[in-house]
């Protein structure tokens, strides 16, 4: 959307929005012959891969983080299991939990997306959570076969994603970023409403993309 005009549209076989953003931007740029300097999108499009692509393409992301709304709730802010609510010590690259125990780096793992993008996850572990009074609040996952009394706290963190999300959050909460998000909501949702109501469209049924 640009000034209430639909400048580009696409259909995708992918069930989620996350994986559709990069192909959409590439396709739009190749057909229009130019690229927008700012990419404004809702939370469904947030991912580490999308952040890195937009930055590498010389553009600026204004994407609403997936945890943006829930992060403002009291429940989220009081959830001691979340790393966001723990103390982080950059000099030691470690987290301090509610009970004052230190979670240090034990290993890193690399994973690859369907498109070939590689993400690095850093694992932080507490050496011993025995006798911790906050254990059931802090360690989640009832399907784990290891008994609770034998389990220790583990955090899995993508440092790149955390950094890009923090940078993006600063942008979208600025006066300019807030204006862009409001404008996106008005234009995109308004146009969608026009198509449904004024043109009386309810559902699109296609067999493949060829037709």
Residue ranges of predicted features:
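Anion-binding and metal-coordination hotspots
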Residues: 1-211
């Amino acid at each position: 959307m640009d000034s209430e005009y639909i400048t580009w549209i696409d259909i995708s076989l992918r069930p989620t929005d996350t994986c559709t953003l990069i192909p959409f931007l590439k396709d739009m740029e190749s057909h229009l012959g130019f690229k927008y300097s700012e990419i404004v999108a809702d939370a469904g499009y947030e991912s580490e891969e999308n952040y890195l692509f937009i930055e590498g393409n010389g553009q600026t992301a204004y994407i609403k983080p997936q945890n943006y709304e829930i992060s403002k709730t009291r429940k989220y802010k009081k959830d001691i299991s979340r790393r966001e609510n723990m103390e982080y010590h950059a000099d030691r690259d470690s987290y301090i939990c509610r009970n004052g125990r230190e979670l240090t780096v034990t290993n890193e793992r690399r994973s690859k997306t369907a498109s070939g993008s590689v993400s690095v996850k850093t694992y932080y572990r507490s050496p011993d959570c025995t006798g911790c009074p906050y254990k059931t609040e802090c360690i989640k996952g009832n399907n784990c076969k290891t008994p609770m009394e034998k389990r220790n706290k583990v955090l899995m963190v993508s440092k790149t994603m955390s950094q890009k999300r923090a940078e993006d959050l600063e942008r979208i909460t600025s006066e300019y970023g807030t204006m862009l998000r409001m404008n996106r909501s008005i234009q995109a949702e308004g146009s969608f409403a026009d198509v449904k109501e004024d043109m009386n469209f309810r559902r699109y049924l296609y067999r493949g993309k060829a037709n």
